[in-house]
Amino acid sequence: MLELNYLSISKSNNTQYGVFKQGDDYVFTCAFDVKDSLILVISDVKDEIEIKIPIDEFKYYGKIYSLVVSGLNLKKFKYYYICDDVICMDPYAKKKCLKRTFGKPYSYTDEDSIIANNEAFFSTDDYDFENDKRPLINHSDVIAYELHVRGFTKHTSSKVKGKGCFLGIIEKIPYFLELNINQIELMPSYDFYEFDKTDVISEEGCEKLNYWGYKSGNYFCPKYEYSYSKDAVSEFKDMVKALHKAGIEIIMQMYFSSDTKHTLIIDCLRYWYTEYRVDGFHVIGPKIPSELIMNDDVLIEAKLLINNINKDDYDILSLYKSSKVIDVNDGFMVAMRRFLKGDSGSLNSFVYYNRLNSPDYRTINYITKYEGFTLNDLVSYERKHNEDNGENNNDGNDENFSWNCGIEGKSAKNSIVKLRTRQIKNALCLLFLAQGTPMLFMGDEFMNTQKGNNNPYCQDNDITWLNWKLNKTSEEILSFTKMLTSFRKNSKILHQNKELMNMDYIQCGNPDISYHQEMAWKSDLSNYHIHIGIMLEGQYSESGDEDTLYITYNMHWENHVFALPRLKDSLEWELVFTTATNEESEEIKADLLNSQDEICVFKRSVVVLRAKHRPLRRINK
């Protein structure tokens, strides 16, 4: 036992990393590859006391060092390690001391600056989650929304107190509810340093800002620069509690580099799931231990989004089927983008992904995400415009499956504005009227633009900050999105727990899903066709009595006449909504009054019909 002033330090056989209180004592456990020396430095919050403890002799097994510190009469303290003269932060630190200004690098030569950025903070404060309960929303009922915490509300137009912070998300909860959003997915919100260290120690010498945060970090801490208050831990928990109270789940994106230890990955996910009560994770990185995560006893009920799951691996596949794992891939995105712009040969893929909803192969649908064009830019640019990134426009994806509607970039030409507005509505229909689970990227609901930048990883400015000031057109898109998400929410037939089979297996007279074009019950998916009608039979809904829907998609640049599947004598087709103009909408209504045999679906438009009971007609005697 080593006695240091009034402290007693003894060896521990603990293998739980980090710091925890054990009675009146504190247990410190860490793992370092030590060549010469390892020192634990503890100080009080006012920096009036500093204690340096050589801990080389407290090696437990392998690289693990563990010690018990008795007599440390501090409820709160700061600490860090010095390994072979290098100042290091505890990889398992739960709180940080320093809150920097986002985007402002620190000096790598000034010792005080280095210490301040590597000091962990420990306190025994408890947080009251009150009666918090996870919403536990069925995957088929989720309407998800991906956002960057800072970019979501940093712009002055957000009109929130906590701009760019977790508090700002709390303040926007009423907005989520208006959009019928019940799950948000946060881009990296753990503590990461926005710059990478280089040999040249100056602001100019640092690499460009990593605004997104897909990099290693202090995985057990929330990002303090995203906190409005000094207490990022409590503010994050306040956010979780408020979201849950509103019936909204929270998914955290966690990026792990290839050299991240698998034990740390599991410990990290467990900690956020149990301590912060998040609902799940989107785990990202080059070497993710998918099988280990899926098989973890603590995480078995957490929602886990994993990129490009290997469905050829039998062991992975069996775990995938039995857990709450969701496969994230770009298949839906590419298929819908190609169909939207009217590519030859795109109909087959559209039909496949529109119906894809296997309970054994859960996926998430999106047309845009953080990486790539926004929805507005998807219909405004055919080429990326990443010059502001400083890489001569060489970064970012060159293949975006986009169409600028005739003019590259911003346009005030009325015909272009109308066509782009129509295409955005069409894209939203492709997303929210498909089976499966939709995810909207922040700002797409009101035509946010990144000015053609499809890789704004280093932009902390108006390119990535949502501008909440709406014009007449963006208000129209926002209103349409709210209507569409409400329609989806209230039409269970659009988000069932099963994949539709194109069969009449309950013998009600119609299959659960059927396809139509110029002739009812017949469809030709040839390469030159870019139009299809899809009927969803209401008797196959969970309740068994929902309205039957007939959704026609015409992404061709010409009008097409669609046959209407014949209904029972007591029913008739009525228009729910269309992405066509008001004048064209009136023509469709007139067509339906004149005949229930066919309708004209105008070029580049979607029409949604439902079967309703015919009104009773009074007979005059």
Which residue stretches match the model-derived regions?
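Aromatic- and acidic-residue-enriched carbohydrate-binding clefts of CAZyme catalytic domains
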Residues: 158-165, 196-245, 258-275, 385-409, ...
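Carboxylate/His-rich catalytic cores and anion/metal-binding grooves
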Residues: 176-208, 372, 376, 380-384
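Active-site neighborhood of glycoside hydrolase catalytic domains
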Residues: 235, 242-314
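C-terminal accessory region downstream of the catalytic core in glycan-modifying enzymes
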Residues: 484, 557-591
